[in-house]
C-alpha cells in the first residue's frame, strides 16, 4: 500500500520529518510518501492562507495518482473537502480523524490550538462533521 501525506504548507523540512516518522510506524508492506506544494504559504494560519494552499494541494494529488490513499497533514484539514472531490480514493485529515477517534474514546472532548486565527476554522470543521 502506498499512502501519500500532503503537508499543505511549503515547509520542506517539516514534510521530510513527517515522512520519516510516518515510515517508522507504518505497517510492513506500507510505504509513505510525504509531499508539499511547490508554491504557497510556509505556514497555514487561517482561512486566508488556506485559499493559497488548495491549488498546490490538488496539484500534489494529481502528481501522486499511484497512491492508494491520501492524508492531509494539517490539523486544520486544509483542502480536505477539495481533495475528496477529485479522487475516489480514501482521503483523511488529521484533524477530522482525531475528532472521530476522540468521540469514540470519550463522551466529550476539547480541541486545543496555539493560534487564535485557527479557532473559526476548527469550530467550522467540528460543526461540518456533526460535533458541537
Model segments located where?
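N-terminal glycine-rich anion-binding loop in soluble enzyme alpha/beta folds
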Residues: 1-55, 114-132
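Glycine/small-residue-rich loop that forms an oxyanion/phosphate-binding "nest" at active or ligand-binding sites
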Residues: 54-107, 111
Amino acid at each position: 500500500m502506498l499512502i501519500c501525506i500532503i503537508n499543505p504548507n511549503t515547509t520542506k523540512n517539516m514534510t521530510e520529518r513527517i515522512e520519516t516518522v510516518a515510515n517508522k510506524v507504518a505497517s510492513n508492506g506500507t510505504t509513505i510518501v510525504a509531499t508539499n506544494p511547490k508554491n504557497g504559504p510556509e505556514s497555514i494560519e487561517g482561512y486566508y492562507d488556506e485559499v493559497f494552499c488548495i491549488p498546490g494541494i490538488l496539484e500534489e494529488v494529481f502528481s501522486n495518482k499511484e497512491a492508494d490513499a491520501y492524508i492531509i497533514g494539517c490539523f486544520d484539514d486544509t483542502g480536505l473537502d477539495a481533495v475528496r472531490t477529485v479522487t475516489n480514493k480514501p482521503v483523511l485529515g488529521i484533524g477530522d480523524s482525531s475528532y472521530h477517534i476522540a468521540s469514540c474514546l470519550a463522551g466529550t472532548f476539547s480541541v486545543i490550538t496555539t493560534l487564535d486565527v485557527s479557532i473559526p476554522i476548527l469550530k467550522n470543521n467540528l460543526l461540518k462533521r456533526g460535533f458541537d
